[in-house]
UniProtKB/Swiss-Prot annotation:
Name under which the protein is recorded: Threonine--tRNA ligase
GO cellular component term, pick one: cytosol
Transmembrane segments: none
Oligomeric and partner information: Homodimer.
Organism for this UniProt entry: Enterobacter sp. (strain 638)
Residues that bind Zn(2+): 334, 385, 511
Localization, UniProt: Cytoplasm
Length: 642
């Protein structure tokens, strides 16, 4: 007679084993109709799974994040159902949930076209609209294998042979005549799976191994209702308009080419943005009392063997040879910073020592994963490492957190999700050390009133970490900032200081990045601002233009005055209509356009327009310059009412 405890603390007693659906029905028919699955003692289960003992139960509906994820997973099965009806010889591989959707890898004897995808989506809708029940059966490993052997599903057989224990009872989900295998849970009925869209096709190797067959990956998105689906599609459309690759070309910021895959060719305007970001970061380094250093971009392989990078990371490292020595081009900056720390005897009085670098790093990312500025092989990190005593960790982490929020707020990022990753099973250091380290990170977050969630067991083997994920205006997540404790690297590279007891001590090392890759951060900002960079970041901040040749000297004089005030300015003296010039510079997202006609020459003023089309009228030149300098100096996100 199980007693079921609900989230509000109320209890219901039953005289038999019950499923989450039974409990929902006992509460009311409305809840039963909305039930997708259950969470029993913290574990997600199907709505039909039986609960035999006392348990805590939460009913999962489409209002829950888990409910949406289950809908997406079931839409992957729906895709399988439809594709087997259209092309019965298709072999099904894997169909997991991903952010905002799902995919299915399929082995098909022809290359899918857009017409095929349209037909597939249509068949999926036809099937879903019959609102058939999804039937789950847990069977023996042997029965599952026999089922898929009979159906010719060699990829499912391979999964059973290589990934599932013979003692397990795999879940087989029956979608009418179609059968799929999954841990689940899945929707109990296809009425939950009406709001989806197939998005694109890509290639994917079976098990991610290029030695295996290339499969076709069909991507889709699915939501709880039509409104949410349409809102997502609108966001995608907006994201396409904001694509940094498209805007980067339009604004002549950078380019990439085949001869240097994953490496950026910065053009003048893009490099201006890059240098402005460096200047901004440097101002914060000074404020938070960091040294700035510069390490070599390659070091002997022997050093990387000492650090452990060679054993764990060599596939991602570029190497070169000279005079019978092998060198690794650095994928990260930390070993170099330890070498700088090791020069000269250090005392506890020298700590904390905060060391920052705009470190040029290279990683051998797979060519298929490269994506504009977001995923590159050559990048610059705003990297820092803090060497401190165990007793200083909390204060240093506290300062790092303040610095992270200080810098992100400058760009207008307000929604930041924070996760604290704790000790994994395989780790170095004592439990006492980990207890203190994890507590230091948690307390530092709490002292800054920052809500966070734990990622249990997700820390590195050498220490716990805090991850900062910022959300942009389209609610996309970008993991940028990290504060990572490291108990290993200083020990591996013999870093030490003399403690108060005159004994040799090993410092704690804190890895700290805020923007992460500057290249990637510029990509994020380009999409966040849709190319309308705040004035302080804009490559060209002001364009001064004449209406006729008679104002040319006045334009030159005004341009020089703006340059002398430290403003990035260009003069446009072309023999073109003023409307043409304004349109062109508006498309180039120049924050301010100053127009000079005869009236402005006579009055010593200038007509001011913003890139958003706002006419601010004819204003005193010195007032305009002072207001612009204030806007730039304060790194304002808003254009001032000059």
């Amino acid at each position: 007679m199980p007693v079921i405890t609900l989230p509000d603390g109320s209890q219901r007693q039953f005289d038999r084993a019950v499923s989450p659906m039974d409990v929902a029905l006992d509460i009311g028919p409305g809840l039963a109709k909305a039930t997708i699955a259950g969470r029993v003692n913290g574990e997600l289960v199907d709505a039909s799974d039986l609960i035999e003992n006392d348990a805590q139960l939460s009913i999962i509906t489409a209002k829950d994040a888990e409910g949406i994820e289950i809908i997406r997973h079931s839409c992957a099965h729906l895709l399988g159902h439809a594709i087997k009806q259209l092309w019965p010889n298709t072999k099904m591989a894997i169909g997991p949930v991903i952010d905002n959707g799902f995919y299915y890898d399929v082995d098909l004897d022809h290359t899918l076209t857009q017409e095929d995808i349209d037909a597939l989506e249509k068949r999926m809708h036809e099937l879903a609209e019959t609102n058939y029940d999804v039937i789950k059966k847990n069977v023996s490993w042997h029965e599952a294998r026999e089922t898929f052997v009979k159906r010719g599903e060699n990829y499912k057989v391979s999964i059973l042979d290589e990934n599932i224990s013979h003692d397990d009872k795999p879940g087989l989900y029956h979608h009418e005549e179609y059968v799929d295998m999954c841990r689940g849970p899945h929707v109990p009925n296809m009425r939950f799976c009406h709001h989806f869209k197939l998005m694109k096709i890509a290639g994917a190797y079976w098990r991610g191994d290029s030695n295996n067959k290339m499969l076709q990956r069909i991507y889709g998105t699915a939501w709880a209702d039509k409104k949410a689906l349409n809102a997502y599609l609108v966001r995608l459309e907006e994201a396409a308009k904001r694509d940094h690759r498209k805007i980067g070309k339009q604004l002549d910021l950078y380019h990439m080419q085949e001869e240097a895959p994953g490496m950026v060719f910065w053009h003048n305007d893009g490099w201006t943005i890059f240098r402005e970001l460096e200047t901004f970061v440097r101002s914060k380094l000074k404020e938070y009392q960091y040294q700035e250093v510069k390490g070599p971009f390659m070091m002997d392989r022997v050093l990387w063997e000492k650090t452990g990078h060679w054993d764990n990371y060599k596939d991602a490292m570029f190497t070169t040879s000279s005079e019978n020595r092998e060198y690794c081009i650095k994928p990260m900056n930390c070993p170099g910073h330890v070498q700088i720390f090791n020069q000269g005897l250090k005392s506890y009085r020298d700590l904390p020592l905060r060391m920052a670098e705009f470190g040029s790093c290279h990683r051998n990312e797979p060519s298929g994963a490269l994506h504009g500025l977001m995923r590159v092989r050559g990048f610059t990190q705003d990297d820092a490492h803090i060497f401190c005593t165990e007793g200083q960790v909390r204060d240093e982490v506290n300062a790092c957190i303040r610095m992270v929020y200080d810098m992100y707020s400058t760009f207008g990022f307000e929604k930041i999700v924070v996760k604290l990753s704790t000790r994994p099973e395989k780790r170095i250091g004592s439990d006492e050390t980990w207890d203190r380290a994890e507590a230091d990170l948690a307390v530092a977050l709490e002292e800054n009133n920052i809500p966070f969630e734990y990622q249990l067991g997700e820390g590195a083997f050498y220490g716990p970490k805090i991850e900062f994920t910022l959300y942009d205006c389209l609610d996309r997540a970008w993991q940028c900032g990290t504060v990572q404790l490291d108990f290993s690297l200083p020990q591996r590279l013999s870093a030490s200081y003399v403690g108060e007891d005159n004994e040799r001590q090993i410092p704690v090392m804190i890895h700290r990045a805020i923007l992460g890759s500057i290249e990637r951060f510029i990509g994020i900002l380009t999409e966040e601002f849709a190319g309308f960079f705040p004035t302080w970041l804009a490559p060209v901040q002001v364009v001064v233009m004449n209406i006729t040749d008679s104002q040319a000297d006045y334009v030159k004089e005004l341009t020089q005055k703006l340059q002398n005030a430290g403003i990035r300015v260009k003069a446009d003296l072309r023999n073109e209509k003023i409307g043409f010039k304004i349109r062109e510079h508006t498309l180039r997202r120049v924050p301010y356009m100053l127009v000079c006609g005869d009236k402005e020459v006579e009055s010593g003023k200038v007509a001011v327009r913003t890139r958003r089309g706002k006419d601010l009228g004819s204003l005193d030149v010195n007032e305009v310059i002072e207001k612009l300098r204030l806007e730039i100096r304060s790194r304002s996100l808003q254009q001032l009412e000059v």
